[in-house]
């Protein structure tokens, strides 16, 4: 396209050159047309410069098109790479989802295996109990037990394999996440490259559009110069015709000059008056030109100030872009904190799951404790049935003293104290009952003495076991109370978390409202840009008006040329020339009024622009204040982030300690299981002894008692040690509760701080707004550059008008001097021919009058 344009341009230039040479030859033949020939050469030089600049612009447009095509290919390749990276990210996400599914399957299998193992443990416990109760097992039961043991070992091996597979899946998942993060980073880099290339392409396109507009403007000016050249050539031809007609009129004037000799003096007086009037008008015109030049200098100074203000605005915009970059970095750090918060929440969910498992186990233990309580009640009833002697009464008193000591031990536990008080009340009632029965059974004491001795050992053993069972029951109840307190605490935390979620939703709505406000501000800025665009169009219209004024000035030059030719007409038409001069004065007065009005309009526009600049400065100050406030808030957020990192490290350390303490649960489970087995064994022994007592094989058997009752001092020491241990454990529990409350408070503060941070949606909208702001800034810069270019063109046109006016005045002066000399010579020859040489010598004033008249006419022509 550019090559075709250049070939057409060279062809048109060749035709114009031929026309120029032809017209130049015609002008060179006539010496009178030398000034027009000089002006014609100037116009041709300007036209030739226009052609050269147009060719240069066409070449530059071709280079810009090649750059745009190259950048477009780069953008396509970058987009292709971006698409490939997106596909890779999708594939990696699918692999991650698949890995998570496999992890879930493995966890389900692991839970099933645990349940199966638990069932097998229960069955093994039942079988072991049956083994202890019965005399022996059948062959089929032994085989079933062996099969169950084999299944247990197989399930254990399968569980270990599942755990190894789960660890493998977790390592694969971590590797996949690392790959995904690397792919995301590469994608972000490619997106940044694409944005950079797009910005480069937009800059190239804007430059190409500016060059195209400049080319169109040069083409338009070239057409106007061609039209002016054609008009000048037609004017030259018409002036040649006027010169021939003027020569004919000169001949007639010489004939008419003889007849007008007597009217010359009267005309001379009127002409002198008109000359004075014209000089006065000329002086006024010079003063008006001086005022116009002053206004032009003031306007140029205002334009310089406007450029300085625009440079300050561009510096402020650069500072705003730097602040936006800092805000983007803050948003990235906030995202990282959000990811850390998500990880902490995941760990919290895991702990909650473990807590739920512990609660289930605690419920199972509670059921076992209830069963043990029932068995203890049965044993106490059996014991009460056998306590029929005075020895039993003494033992009851000892038990009552022990009960009182135990009541003092468990004053802190309200639930257990109530149970013990009820039991004591029941025992007291039974004691009264036994007192009545003791009076009746005194005669039976001797018969039951031997039986009592046999059962005392069994009763003491049972009491010892009952005390141990009660202590274990108390421990289980303490554990149950601690777990229940933890459950209440976590339920309270759940309620607080739900409240925080509601608060975050409310903040999200507020942020949505703020986003809507930002959108409204952007629409306001768009309206402001449209207003600036319309003002730019107004400046273009003013440029067109100035161009029209230039055309009018050229037409004025043509009218002045016609006035020069009209001065060759006969002297009788001087009155008509004076009237035309009055009309010219009125027209110039109108033009002067128009110029004054335009000056007033420019003054009002300048005032409005100053007001707009003041408003812009106010906005800039407000934005600077908001930026400073944002910087202070940003520093505060950094300090909070550092504090939160320290607290997060403490929380992780405490979480690790808690996990290590949780690992002791398996040991406790094993101890509970071992104690259960021992309890079953003891029950079988008790049952066997009771059967032997009911059905004794050897009635007269007896043996020496090896055991003895523990002393009261030893029991008190044991109770005191147990009380000390209980107090220390209670203090540890209180410290742990305080520590947990402090960590929960710290966690809530961290969560609130994270909730105040903006989300990724706000960051995306902010990036979109920043991109729109950059585009609008580029548009404003382009419009400002075009405005400066048009103002420079207007100044060039004004300087060109002044130069043409000066050249016209110089040409008029030269022409009038030449005509004055010619008329003086003609008048002198005419007088010499009319009066003769002797009479010419006697009339020195005649030539002076004629020359004076011509000089006055020259003065009129000058005006």
From Swiss-Prot:
InterPro entries, per database record: CFAP58_CC
Alphabetized Pfam families for the sequence: CFAP58_CC (PF21771)
UniProt-recorded name of the protein: Cilia- and flagella-associated protein 58
Protein species of origin: Chlamydomonas reinhardtii (Chlamydomonas smithii)
GO cellular component, one term: motile cilium
Protein origin, superkingdom: Eukaryota
Family under the similarity heading: Belongs to the CFAP58 family.
Compositional bias per record (Gly residues), positions renumbered to this chain: 845-863
UniProt main location, coarse: other
Gene it is expressed from: CFAP58
